[in-house]
Amino acid sequence: MPSSPHPFLDHPSPIPFAHRGGASDWPENTLPAFEAAVRLGYRYLETDVQATADGVLLAFHDDDLRRTCGVAGRISELPWSKVSEARVHGREPIPLFADLVEAFPDARLNIDCKTDAALEPLAAALKRDHLLDRVCIGSFSHRRITRLRRMFGSELCTAMSPSEVARWVSGVMPKGAHVAQVPVRQGPMPVVTGRSVERAHRHGIPVHVWTIDDAAEMHRLLDLGVDGLMTDRPEVLRDVLVERGTWR
């Protein structure tokens, strides 16, 4: 497979990602979760971004606070002064995206832009903090990905949108994305197969798979030739890669 020209992807394959910092072991998307992953040796941290009603960018997955914080309220409808009072699992504050950038200056950040409201604050942060070499952006919205590509061009590493993934799996390689970041299956449709991985590699596109927590499945996917795995169980993935001699 040709090497990617983007600096975000210059780590030897396979790349291990701590998904939300390691959501099975720590309160997800919190500084302690990311700190634990970095202590294990992770250089790639996966996170999500949401924006408050007053445009403050947060590292947080849901718009609704109930699942992780146990309180009513939507981030997009509340000012940061209110959202900042919430605690993940009752104890950890929701971090600002800027906190994550500052706390882990050597980490690469894989970012899922969750909403349209988060797009402009995210773009501003990428410019302000000169982050283009150390981030990759994905989204379930093709429109959001397209807007970011128009803003930054190929200097911004972007993952395939769902519609681009569908084209890739059907045999037509889309243009514009630097990487495929995908589940093993999308509903009934297999996504990660030997054939799809080979097709991506033929076009110079690495394949990262989420979210894989079982050691046997990690081995199976690595045997297929995937280039990265995202996991909620960072210790398990580290041990698998150590066993294979590919923990770097």
What are the roles of these predicted feature ranges?
Residues M1-R248:
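Phosphate-group recognition and catalysis centered on beta-loop-alpha active-site segments
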